[in-house]
Amino acid sequence: MDSKRAMVLRMEGTNNEEEAFLSLKRAGFEPEYVHINDLARKRKFIDDYNLMFIPGGFSAGDYIRAGAIFAARLRPFLSDINKFIDSGRFIIGVCNGFQVLTELGLFFNGDRKIALTVNESNRFECRFTYIRLSTKKVLSGLGNRPFQVPVAHLEGRVYCDNKTLDELIENDQIIFRYVDNNGNYSGYPWNPNGSIMNIAGITNDSGNVIGMMPHPERVYYPYQMSGNERNSDKGTGEIFFRILYNST
């Protein structure tokens, strides 16, 4: 594959596919919408792509729990997905996509060691906050500065036991943490869901499976951002997706 082909995977209830598609395209990828039925009917194949992007939304209405049904629909392709990961190619799951990756256990070689549970506020949280890179594994071009990002979720609180948290820290798998506008770790509302250690996103041990609750695809341009951030030279999304492109 000479070009970097990106699959934007969708099913009933996903959203933000268009924002994801356009962000990937503007960053240099060659994106393509792929419905879960395209895989099931062998019209399209995971191995034909360099990157898989699982967008946000409410897949299958979030029945049972967020991301559970989408993950069940993907489980027949788990062998192909693991080969995709082992080859060094990237999977990105944003919001509902993060929930899907969690259900599949892709951060811990098939083990479901974390949960994304209901926000501490017990309500849907939809607004801007900030995140900061917290790993040296991947996306190092983001540096140490805070980035404004929108969040929109009810079940985004990262929860795990102490042993798993120690593993995440030891293996440098916490990729993003919520911060305030000065880059300091802070509680609600900057941490919109009460995630342990302000975790906004994690990776697998290799750094090529990334799950995050915030939506960089919604702020590709500065005018999509809030307050003084609208005066930035580039939107958070452009910075994120261009660095992602260079990492793949």
Curated annotation (Swiss-Prot):
Question: What GO molecular function terms would the record report?
Answer: ATP binding; glutaminase activity; phosphoribosylformylglycinamidine synthase activity
GO cellular component terms, alphabetically, are: cytoplasm
Which GO BP annotation is one of this protein's?
'de novo' IMP biosynthetic process
Q: Where in the cell is it found?
A: Cytoplasm
Q: Where is the active site?
A: 95, 215, 217
Task: Enumerate the catalysed reactions.
Answer: N(2)-formyl-N(1)-(5-phospho-beta-D-ribosyl)glycinamide + L-glutamine + ATP + H2O = 2-formamido-N(1)-(5-O-phospho-beta-D-ribosyl)acetamidine + L-glutamate + ADP + phosphate + H(+); L-glutamine + H2O = L-glutamate + NH4(+)
Q: In which pathway does it act?
A: Purine metabolism; IMP biosynthesis via de novo pathway; 5-amino-1-(5-phospho-D-ribosyl)imidazole from N(2)-formyl-N(1)-(5-phospho-D-ribosyl)glycinamide: step 1/2
Role this protein plays: Part of the phosphoribosylformylglycinamidine synthase complex involved in the purines biosynthetic pathway. Catalyzes the ATP-dependent conversion of formylglycinamide ribonucleotide (FGAR) and glutamine to yield formylglycinamidine ribonucleotide (FGAM) and glutamate. The FGAM synthase complex is composed of three subunits. PurQ produces an ammonia molecule by converting glutamine to glutamate. PurL transfers the ammonia molecule to FGAR to form FGAM in an ATP-dependent manner.
Q: Give the protein's recorded name.
A: Phosphoribosylformylglycinamidine synthase subunit PurQ
Its gene name is purQ
